[in-house]
């Protein structure tokens, strides 16, 4: 009798490298490949267990002396925007969001390059080429979409890609319990629009419409100013050694509150 078994995923550990968020710290990651017929199922399980996806890799911090990286997810069905978030929604009332298959475009890369050059000149992604970007978008074995955010132009109708300037884009995985924001970027010259906040609010709206509970934001690092924005979206849960627990925002410094 022939019995077929599904191979278990193999996990690997990276060598130590400088932490991009906390000075004087070293980071290590544990990772596995998301390929094959069970890739989407594994992505769900691993994301719910604190992993993040990058291309066909799922990874999680495995640092020897630091536990600062904390997985964060918004409780979408309970979420209500704050006054400042309502102002962000109003400021972007002229924006059309359209969902597409995970396929790159030269227009996307041009905006992505502009974002990196302004926001992440020293980061690990700073030298990404157009081919690197295409791989980031296309190399997925799960249910991945790219959402484009464009300024509405008169005459925009039912065409496949609405007219208007591309302001922002988000690479997003649809999972059994919600949406996971894999990577997002925007025009850094339009600071008054708070496009990063707007994209998160749009993902909460989409998750609510799907009747699903969670929007996964990746890792929050207390002490890293570039991560502070994630705690403004309440209520939310943080993954602790005891599992997912509701986060108390009153424990944060005032600067991170609305």
UniProtKB/Swiss-Prot annotation:
Statement: the UniProt record of this protein carries the keyword Amino-acid biosynthesis: no
Signal peptide: none
Keyword field: Acyltransferase, Cytoplasm, Transferase
Main location per the UniProt record: cytoplasm
GO cellular component: cytoplasm
Pfam families attached to this UniProt entry: ATE_C (PF04377), ATE_N (PF04376)
UniProt catalytic activity: N-terminal L-glutamyl-[protein] + L-leucyl-tRNA(Leu) = N-terminal L-leucyl-L-glutamyl-[protein] + tRNA(Leu) + H(+); N-terminal L-aspartyl-[protein] + L-leucyl-tRNA(Leu) = N-terminal L-leucyl-L-aspartyl-[protein] + tRNA(Leu) + H(+)
Compartments where found: Cytoplasm
EC number in record: 2.3.2.29
GO terms of biological process kind: ubiquitin-dependent protein catabolic process via the N-end rule pathway
GO MF entries: arginyl-tRNA--protein transferase activity; leucyl-tRNA--protein transferase activity
Protein family membership: Belongs to the R-transferase family. Bpt subfamily.
Described purpose of this protein according to its UniProt entry: Functions in the N-end rule pathway of protein degradation where it conjugates Leu from its aminoacyl-tRNA to the N-termini of proteins containing an N-terminal aspartate or glutamate.
HAMAP family, A to Z: Bpt
Database matches in PANTHER family: ARGININE-TRNA-PROTEIN TRANSFERASE 1, ARGINYL-TRNA--PROTEIN TRANSFERASE 1
Name recorded for this polypeptide: Aspartate/glutamate leucyltransferase
Name of the gene encoding the protein in the UniProt record: bpt
């Amino acid at each position: 009798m022939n019995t077929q078994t599904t191979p278990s995923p193999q996990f690997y550990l990276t060598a130590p490298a400088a932490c991009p968020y906390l000075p004087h710290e070293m980071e290590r990651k544990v990772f596995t490949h998301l390929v094959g017929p069970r890739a989407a199922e594994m992505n769900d399980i691993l994301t719910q267990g604190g992993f993040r996806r990058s291309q066909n890799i799922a990874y999680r911090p495995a640092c020897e002396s630091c536990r600062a990286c904390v997985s964060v997810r918004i409780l979408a069905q309970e979420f209500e925007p704050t006054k400042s978030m309502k102002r962000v929604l109003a400021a972007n009332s002229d924006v059309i969001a359209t969902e597409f298959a995970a396929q790159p475009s030269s227009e996307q890369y041009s905006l992505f390059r502009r974002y990196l050059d302004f926001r992440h000149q020293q980061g690990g992604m700073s030298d990404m080429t157009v081919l690197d970007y295409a791989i980031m978008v296309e190399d997925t074995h799960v249910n991945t979409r790219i959402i484009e955010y464009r300024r509405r132009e008169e005459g925009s109708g039912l065409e496949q890609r609405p007219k208007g300037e591309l302001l922002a884009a988000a690479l997003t995985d649809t999972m059994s319990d919600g949406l996971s924001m894999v990577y997002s970027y925007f025009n850094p010259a339009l600071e008054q629009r708070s496009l990063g906040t707007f994209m998160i609010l749009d993902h909460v709206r989409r998750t609510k419409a799907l009747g699903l509970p969670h929007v996964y934001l990746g890792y929050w690092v207390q002490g890293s100013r570039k991560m502070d924005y994630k705690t403004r979206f309440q209520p939310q849960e943080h993954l602790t050694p005891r599992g997912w627990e509701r986060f108390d925002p009153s424990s944060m410094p005032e600067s991170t509150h609305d």
